[in-house]
């Protein structure tokens, strides 16, 4: 089992898919990494040589912010927006959708379960 950026990659997956298990590397980044390191996207993870793993590790460390560093960076960006009092920071603070989605209906994931309010009595 190959270990890259602190993540154990699944053995039986194609490299193109296995690399997406690393936080911060999606399908496009995975393809670019494999092209740069000249590794076939159809190669299975368990068929990688130590040399290929080292190439991938070096390429990831050189070009991408991944896993813990990326998570910290995202959290720091959110904290900064909250501190400067931007509209996005305000939405983060209130636990509402940040990117302009409607909230009259929907937005339940962000707002949590419904809080029932006493209705009009008949």
Curated annotation (Swiss-Prot):
The keyword Iron does not apply. SUPFAM superfamilies: S13-like H2TH domain. InterPro entries: Rbsml_uS13_C, Ribosomal_uS13, Ribosomal_uS13-like_H2TH, Ribosomal_uS13_bac-type, Ribosomal_uS13_CS. Keywords: Ribonucleoprotein, Ribosomal protein, RNA-binding, rRNA-binding, tRNA-binding. Residues 93-122 are annotated as: Disordered. GO terms for molecular function: rRNA binding; structural constituent of ribosome; tRNA binding. GO terms for biological process: translation. Located at the top of the head of the 30S subunit, it contacts several helices of the 16S rRNA. In the 70S ribosome it contacts the 23S rRNA (bridge B1a) and protein L5 of the 50S subunit (bridge B1b), connecting the 2 subunits; these bridges are implicated in subunit movement. Contacts the tRNAs in the A and P-sites. Belongs to the universal ribosomal protein uS13 family. NCBIfam families: uS13_bact (TIGR03631). Part of the 30S ribosomal subunit. Forms a loose heterodimer with protein S19. Forms two bridges to the 50S subunit in the 70S ribosome. This is Small ribosomal subunit protein uS13. It comes from Corynebacterium kroppenstedtii (strain DSM 44385 / JCM 11950 / CIP 105744 / CCUG 35717).
């Amino acid at each position: 089992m190959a270990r890259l950026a602190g993540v154990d990659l699944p053995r039986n997956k194609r490299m193109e898919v296995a690399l997406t298990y690393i936080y911060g590397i999606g399908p496009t980044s995975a393809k670019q990494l494999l092209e740069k390191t000249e590794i076939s996207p159809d190669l299975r993870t368990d068929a990688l040589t130590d040399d290929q793993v080292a190439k991938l590790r070096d390429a990831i460390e050189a070009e991408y912010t991944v896993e813990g560093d990326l998570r910290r960076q995202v959290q720091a960006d959110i904290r900064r927006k909250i501190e400067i009092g931007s509209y996005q920071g305000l939405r983060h603070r209130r636990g509402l959708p940040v990117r302009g989605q409607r909230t009259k209906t929907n937005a339940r994931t962000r707002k949590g379960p419904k809080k029932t309010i006493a209705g009009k009595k008949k």
